[in-house]
Amino acid sequence: MAVCIRLARGGKKKKPVYSVVVADKRMARDGRFLEKLGQYIPMKEGGTFAINQERYAHWISQGAKPSETVGKLVAKQQNAAEA
């Protein structure tokens, strides 16, 4: 089973809210997932991103691959925390 960490779209028309989820790569974008790790709201000023770092690290250690977008958001959050 190929597991990935990706964004699942929710919210209203023209006002997206994305959930950061762990899902089987074969499932639909907004379909079944294994665990919800956090949330990304791009419409707020600067974008609001929150993720459970402990669970994220757990899934990475288990072999889950983050999507390109999730990888960038996590790296941006870690850089902001260090500064």
Curated annotation (Swiss-Prot):
Short name of any one Pfam family annotated for the protein: Ribosomal_S16
InterPro entries recorded: Ribosomal_bS16, Ribosomal_bS16_CS, Ribosomal_bS16_dom_sf
A cellular component annotation (GO) from this entry: cytoplasm
Membrane-spanning intervals of the chain: none
GO biological process, one term: translation
Keyword Ribosomal protein: yes
Gene Ontology molecular function, alphabetical: structural constituent of ribosome
Keywords on record: Ribonucleoprotein, Ribosomal protein
Disulfide bonds: none
NCBIfam families: S16
Family from the record: Belongs to the bacterial ribosomal protein bS16 family.
Protein name: Small ribosomal subunit protein bS16
